[in-house]
Structures are given as C-alpha cells and as structure tokens.
C-alpha cells in the first residue's frame, strides 16, 4: 500500500493572517478547499496543509486544542537545495515567524527551522542521499 496524498490538519486562530503568511513565504493556496474556516496550503502536488480555525478543528477531534505552550507535532519538509531551505525560513521569519535554532549542516544534510505565526514547528531540510555516510 502507498499513500497518494497527505493532508496535515493544524488549528489556527486567524485564517486570513495564516493565508497571508504562507502566501508570503512562497506557497500557493488551493482556493477550492479554502473558506472562512480553513485554508489549504499546497506544499506539493500531493502534500497539503489544512489550517483550520480552532472551532472548526474541534469538530474533527474530541481532544482540546493546545494553547500554545505545548508541542504536539513538528512538521518536516524537504526542499531541493540549501538555498531553498534558507529562502523559506528567511521569508517565514520576515513575516512574523521566529527561527527555532541555528541552521544545522551535516555535510550531506542541511536543516533550518522556525515556529510559524500560529506556534507550529517546521523543520525545513535538504538532503543529498548520495552523500549520506554509510555505517
């Protein structure tokens, strides 16, 4: 079995600000799946992030929405170059996110990270698997 699409659902307080943030970072919006309760950010042809208002998110889960002082998930995305990694993180920070830690360079893999305007953690990576050390 193989998954053919992934939709990550995350709660947010403000749909419009979230839409503006991710557009400024450089991602497109699937308007067909967006409205005043949700915005669908297109990460790739098969990967989407559905940012849902906290109230709407609650209709899918009986568990409470975290209040911002806890971490339930860190979303990791892979890009095509170190430059793209820094471009995304720098654009996120320029639009209200904050950098989680200094970039990590492992030679074959490069990672940078940020907390978005809603407090969600993002690890942004580039990996050259042909250079991965063999143990």
Predicted regions and their residues:
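Residue-level signal for the nucleotide or nucleotide-sugar donor/cofactor binding architecture
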Residues: 10-13, 80
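Conserved catalytic core of two-component sensor histidine kinases
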Residues: 9, 16, 86
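Vicinal oxygen chelate
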Residues: 1-6, 27-82, 86-115, 126-135
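Conserved active-site tyrosine of GNAT-family acetyltransferases
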Residues: 18-22, 92, 119
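Amphipathic alpha-helical segments
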Residues: 14-29
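Conserved beta-strand-loop-alpha-helix junction that forms the acyl-donor binding cleft
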Residues: 12-14, 105-106
């Amino acid at each position: 079995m193989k998954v053919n699409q992934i939709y990550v659902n995350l709660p947010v307080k403000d749909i419009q600000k979230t839409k503006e943030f991710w557009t400024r970072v450089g991602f497109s919006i699937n308007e067909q799946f967006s409205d005043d309760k949700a915005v669908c950010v297109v990460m790739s042809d098969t990967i989407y992030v559905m940012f849902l208002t906290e109230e709407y998110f609650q209709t899918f889960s009986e568990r409470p929405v975290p209040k911002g002082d806890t971490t339930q998930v860190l979303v990791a995305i892979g890009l095509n170059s170190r430059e793209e990694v820094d471009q995304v993180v720098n654009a996120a920070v320029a639009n209200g996110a904050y950098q989680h830690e200094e970039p990590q360079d492992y030679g074959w893999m490069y990672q940078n990270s940020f907390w978005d305007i809603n407090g969600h953690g993002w690890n942004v990576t580039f990996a050259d698997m042909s250079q991965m050390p063999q143990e």
